[in-house]
């Protein structure tokens, strides 16, 4: 038997989306029309609404013990949402598509997947996390700080990328970035960077003291550290990599101009 759900439609020009959830599967995806909507289970502990331009979803308490995980779905139209804020415990979070300003997530444990998403910046803080960022454009920064984390970024652009964890492996595949720092006290780091080797200042430190450093000034910087583990770095020479920053800026400016025209 299907769970009963409630659909809440909000103002499409929301300035923020805010969630406070626990033991839930949360999906934030691109809407098929211009409606900003939330689908939540019919339950006493879950509610949704809007206030002063902020769409919110909150759980007043945890679901009953041994009950099925609650499913929450938010559909976002194709325009910029200036802020996405999420405070979660034991949740699976998926952001698929959309254009955002600042994305801020605090998650005690669970999985976070960001795919085909544009954002000015993404910041994730938490405890035990499995994080996957794929085919996304982060104009500003990607910042992750977790107690334990398995991290993977694929085919993604980030002006600045910083990932720190006490324990866990990190992998990046075809990441285009000007500056990247990966740090784990216990884990392996595998990185494939877009660009030519000679364009990067490279510094890697592994096994408590084995350091390799260029000691140079170049257009891009990559730093990696592991106290217990190994570091492998490779490069993909892609002529388009140098232009992605310009393309990202043009795309963001075009989106902002479109929003300003709509507002006027």
Tell me the role of every PLM-derived stretch:
Residues 1-264:
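Intrinsically disordered, low-complexity terminal regions
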